[in-house]
From Swiss-Prot:
This is Glyceraldehyde-3-phosphate dehydrogenase. Belongs to the glyceraldehyde-3-phosphate dehydrogenase family. GO terms for cellular component: cytosol. One of its GO terms (molecular function) is NADP binding. PROSITE patterns: GAPDH.
Length: 360
């Protein structure tokens, strides 16, 4: 089977990690990168050395010329266009484009990639109008005619699988979520101007900073049964990677904590294996650096007040786990499109056979 050819727009944290995931896979191929702010030699350096995930050791990486990188013997074309519609994705064969700049997050802006020859665009951020998919939760609802989709946020990818299991088994009346979230590139190293979010302008390296997040509300978009039942907030903390969700919910059906643990463990070993994890170990955040699962339930960290009121805790590598899901979503989209193409081809063959038979 032919590899899925992927391009990346924006070579920041998520762009580079998505590239690492693609380059370590057997069924996907990175064919192009666009970033107007980085030269190929600096791009090589940024990709090779990563303070969190370590040095790249899988292929030799070098600059062939100012428009080509070599990963081993595999060439990757580099563009430097600011306007998405000017990026010639079609020349490289990139059918799927990961939009990871954080700028072009609505459908109209992301659709500009289609003008350059891309067939599908995956936004690596929440979107106000593009359909959102969380692998393990609602990716089966993807239809091949959808050309612009969102992979939601890293926090929604952690929360949604957990919320789905709890709602399916016990029912959620309402709930509040807090994510204790590692710092990201949008924060300040020292106190600086941040007109829209004054607290967000304070130094990330030695403050716990309350912040807003739409991650809990977004769960209602991927799980309509929970629409309006969840909301939440964030605390940004001075760690460089790995975050943790605290979900406190009121249940429809009474349940013991042991029953809740058993339900989550069952799903983590069944339909959601590889997406939802389960641990009873005495873990801390650094134990999950490089974990490619979306959500790892911490059985020892949760508590019950009574049979209807429970606090659940789940960890996630907000960088690597999320980047892994971006590629998984592309795989699913490709398989869905391929199945449709096969059905269409079979229909054409059947019609052709009927026509030939009637002519005879």
């Amino acid at each position: 089977m032919a590899k899925v050819k992927i391009g990346i727009n924006g070579f920041g944290r998520i762009g580079r990690l998505v590239a690492r995931v693609i380059l370590q896979s057997d069924d996907c191929e990175l064919v192009a990168i666009n970033d107007p702010f980085i030269t190929t030699d600096y791009m090589t350096y940024m990709f090779k050395y990563d303070s969190v995930h370590g040095q790249w050791k899988h292929h030799e990486l070098k600059v062939k010329d100012e428009k080509t990188l070599l990963f081993g013997e595999r060439p990757v074309t580099v563009f430097g266009n600011r306007n998405p519609e000017e990026i010639p994705w079609g020349q490289t064969g990139a059918d799927y484009v990961v939009e990871s700049t954080g700028v072009f997050t609505d459908k109209d802006k992301a659709a500009a990639h289609l003008k350059g020859g891309a067939k599908k665009v995956i936004i690596s951020a929440p979107s106000k109008d593009a359909p959102m998919f969380v692998v393990g939760v609602n990716e089966h609802e993807y239809k091949s005619e959808l050309n612009i989709v969102s992979n939601a946020s890293c926090t929604t990818n952690c929360l949604a699988p957990l919320a789905k299991v709890i709602n399916d088994k016990f029912g959620i009346v309402e709930g509040l979520m807090t994510t204790v979230h590692s710092i990201t590139a949008t924060q300040k190293t020292v106190d600086g101007p941040s007109a829209k979010d004054w607290r967000g302008g304070r130094a990330a390296s030695f403050n716990i900073i309350p912040s807003s997040t739409g991650a809990a509300k977004a769960v209602g978009k991927v799980l309509p049964a929970l629409n309006g039942k969840l909301t939440g907030m964030s605390f940004r903390v001075p760690t460089v990677d790995v975050s943790v969700v605290d979900l406190t919910v009121r249940l429809e059906k009474e349940a013991t904590y042991e029953q809740i643990k058993a339900a989550i463990k069952e799903e983590s070993e069944g339909k959601m294996k590889g997406i939802l994890g389960y641990t009873e170990d005495d873990v801390v955040s650094t134990d999950f650096v490089g974990d490619n699962r979306s959500s790892i339930f911490d059985a020892k960290a949760g508590i019950c007040l009574n049979g209807n009121f429970v606090k659940l805790v789940s960890w996630y590598d907000n960088e690597w786990g999320y980047s892994s899901r971006v590629v998984d979503l592309i795989r699913h989209m490709s398989k869905t499109t391929s199945k449709l193409d096969s059905v269409a081809l079979a229909c054409v063959d059947a019609v052709s056979t009927l026509i030939l038979s009637s002519e005879c």
